[in-house]
Amino acid sequence: MACEIMPLRSSQEDERPLSPFYLSAHVSQVSNVSTTGELLERTIRSAVEEHLFDVSNAGDQSSEDSEPGPSSASSIPTRQRGHQFKKQDDVWHGCDKELINKENIPSGFSGCAECILNSQEAERFQDDICDYVGERSKPKRQKSSSRLAKLSDNHDGALSMESLSSMQSQETLEPEAAEPLSSESKEIERGGRDTQHCENPTMKIQEHPSLSDTKQQRNQDGEDQQESFVPDMPQLDLTALCDEKTWEEPIPSWQPENADSDEARLSPQAGRLIHQFLDEDSDPMLSPRFYAYGQSRQYLDDTEVPPSPPNSHSFMRRRSSSLGSYDDEQEDLTPVQLTRRIQTLKKKIRKFEDRFEEERKYRPSHSDKAANPEVLKWTNDLAKFRKQLKESKLKISEEDLTPRTRQRSNTLPKSFGSQLEKEDEKKQELLDKAIRPSVEATLEGILRKLQEKRVESSRPEDIKDMTKDQIANEKVALQKALLYYESIHGRPVTKTERQIMKPLYDRYRLVKQILSRASTVPIIGSPSSKRRSPSLQPIIEGETASFFKEIKEQEEGSEDDSSTKPDFAVTLKTDCSAHCFLDQLEDDADGFISPMDDKMPSKCSQDSGLSNLHSASIPELLEYLQEMREEKKMIRKKLHDFEDNFFRQNGRNVQKEDRTPMAEEYNEYKHIKAKLRLLEVLISKRDSDSKSM
């Protein structure tokens, strides 16, 4: 029956190309093999039953001559029958394996008689096929056509008619032996399918090493199981398949540049784009999410792998420790910034204390604050910032102790100017300190020059003895001397410098005040000087007030060369001339004419009018009081209008420096108020005198 099936299979073999890449195609033929086995079993079973029926009708002699197998089989014990069945199963297993693998043999067996092997050669051929399957899992690239052709040549002379006799002896088995035979053949077919499925096609160029290791393990396990049932046979020697006798390890068609590592490599077709980057000397970087999906490091040194995080690449340069950290690069905080941070931390800690007190009804202690990590951080930062603020203030105070040549502009930043300019300034300061004279020597030179100028211009040393022009010249000379001193030593900062230069600065200040405040200097002997005093003379009831007694005494003491005159009008004329002289001195010295200066002669006349009030009667005083009140109301209305307009325009109240446009009105208003107070005092005095009389 096997000879009838083989022509069909040979026709299929002619249509299929013989290539090692089609080794996996024989799996589809397993179903045909199984149907062939079932057909063989049915045929054998029917033949055995028919033969037994014929034997039962024939005689004992004819049955012994024609069929010795069944009679001997009935007489042998059961254990021997089991061994016989096992050998027969091995023969059938070899036949099935031969039928399955026959399509890979191009021109081995042509006839029907060549399809049947004896049991020993079938077992040997089965072991060779298993070894061949194991060798297929290794990455050796050999041509299977030449190898199978050589294998078929070695087995051409091993065929004999003994296999035919064994096949005929199997046909005489009992029906009871046919059932275990069918079950054993099914198990063998399942084993053949497993071996077929264990064999992977070689269409892949390269596999992972772990997969190849597992496949080799499975193949080795399968060989061990087969060797447990099949007796040990010599393995297939593949050296005879090839003319060359020197065998070496397989060489892959593509080798990476760093072939030292034994890690698995990807296909060369996968990294063409990365090759372009590598040609431009740009190292591929690893992705930041590379290490989140495992601890595998087999692709770290492979430049063909897509980008990965740079922290594990062998060609990635580490950050130098000399560059410093981010904290070192932070600039020092200014005192203002430190104060703001301290205030912010205080607010946070205060909020925590209030919330803690609301929840637990008591103030948090230091341990309560330390238990909270956030508050503990705030406390530590607060202490650190306070320490930095204290150190910065101490540093600034130490820097301020050293005298500076000039005040630095606040509009310019601290880093204004290049480093070379700063170095030049420092060098210049050192040279100036070496050449600069002492403060005492500079002061002596200044005083000597001032004395020489006084002698040249014939000015007295005492300011009281100077005239208008002499005071102005003294002011200019002192101003030039002080500017010369400040150009050398700067403004006096230390206590010793201030004590040394104090007399010269005081003299300049006094001269300047005399020139700038000549209009406000009280005139000796003038009734208005007494009126401008902070407080009036106390008026005692029952006594006559003497308003001009002290004034006449001052006149007598100041005028040594001139004789005193009892007439008060002469004194007023002298006072008015002196006042006008001081006004002229102020105009010549400062060059500024105040609108109040034109009204000063009228003040002299007003003072002369006020002097007559003491001899006036009560009706005259009352009339004059009424006039002063009306005049006060008019001036006050003008001043109120001016202040309201100024507030609407500028949005603020009038300050002292804003009163310049209305300076005359303000001054007149002040004098009118003083007159009103004097008139009220005189009227009250006259009333008291009249009542007493």
From Swiss-Prot:
Start-end of Low complexity biased regions: 159-171
Residue numbers carrying Phosphothreonine: T402
Entries under InterPro entries matching the protein: FAM13
Bias-annotated ranges (Basic and acidic residues): 184-197
Chloroplast in keyword set: no
Name recorded for this polypeptide: Protein FAM13A
Stretch list, region Disordered: 56-89, 136-233, 302-331, 396-424
Function: (Microbial infection) Plays a role in the clearance of Pseudomonas aeruginosa by macrophages. In complex with ANXA2, promotes activation of Rho GTPases following P.aeruginosa infection.
Tagged with keyword Phosphoprotein: yes
Quaternary structure and interacting proteins, as annotated: Interacts with ANXA2.
Gene: Fam13a
Induction of synthesis: Up-regulated in alveolar macrophages following Pseudomonas aeruginosa infection.
Tissue specificity annotation: Expressed in the mammary gland, with similar levels at all stages of development, including pregnancy, lactation and involution.
Family, similarity comment: Belongs to the FAM13 family.
Keywords tagged on the record: Phosphoprotein
